[in-house]
Amino acid sequence: AACQLGTAASFARDKQDYPAVRSDGRQDSKDSTLDRIAKRCSEGGDFCSKNSECCDKKCQDEGEGRGVCLIVPQNVILLH
């Protein structure tokens, strides 16, 4: 049983390391951009500044050069 548990834990850990790659080798559509896969942008809820870019391009200024990336729901059109 311990051996099976270790295998399950190992599988779960491996799956977490590569969440954007499906078992058939294709990228998951929700993480289809290179920026998200390479984590070159900040996700919603992460801190941001004028020197860092949010994946959804929405950094809410919190003052003193700090901000928070807004969480933008999918399938919602933002008006500027």
Curated annotation (Swiss-Prot):
Cystine connections: C41-C55, C48-C59, C54-C69
GO-annotated cellular components: extracellular region
Record key words, sorted: Cleavage on pair of basic residues, Disulfide bond, Ion channel impairing toxin, Knottin, Neurotoxin, Secreted, Signal, Toxin
GO MF, one example: ion channel regulator activity
Propeptide cleavage-removed residue intervals: 9-40
Keyword hit for Protease: no
Primary location recorded for the protein, binned into one broad class: secreted
Annotated signal peptide: 1-8
Subcellular location: Secreted
Expression tissues: Expressed by the venom duct.
Tagged with keyword DNA-binding: no
Domain remark text: The presence of a 'disulfide through disulfide knot' structurally defines this protein as a knottin.
Family label: Belongs to the conotoxin O1 superfamily.
Protein name per the record: Conotoxin Bu14
Organism: Conus bullatus
